[in-house]
């Protein structure tokens, strides 16, 4: 007796839930498998992608050729005095701001790069 897929589906559909559970148990035993759903393994770096970063650090990596403009930009962004801003620029690489939003970090990076500095967001 050979059943088509359609006939097999109709036969299963006509069974009660308890009969289907018994059928599944018998199939598991016959074929040596389990009907349990396997959990999908996360893709490489999945945990990092799922946990999106919300706080960023802006790091001045190099002052560039126009140090005066960079010092002015650092003063405007951080509120430091002239001497503190100059010391910070000359001690590059240095953290300018820590724990700021992505938008604020991007704005600061843009302003410093326009002044001639090399900046990283971490």
From Swiss-Prot:
Subunit description: Homodimer. Part of the ribosomal stalk of the 50S ribosomal subunit. Forms a multimeric L10(L12)X complex, where L10 forms an elongated spine to which 2 to 4 L12 dimers bind in a sequential fashion. Binds GTP-bound translation factors.
Gene3D superfamilies: 3.30.1390.10, Single helix bin
HAMAP family: Ribosomal_bL12
PANTHER family: 39S RIBOSOMAL PROTEIN L12, LARGE RIBOSOMAL SUBUNIT PROTEIN BL12M
NCBIfam families: L12
Job of this protein: Forms part of the ribosomal stalk which helps the ribosome interact with GTP-bound translation factors. Is thus essential for accurate translation.
Gene from which this protein is expressed: rplL
Keyword hit for Ribosomal protein: yes
Record-stated family: Belongs to the bacterial ribosomal protein bL12 family.
Cellular component aspect of the GO annotation: cytosolic large ribosomal subunit
Protein name: Large ribosomal subunit protein bL12
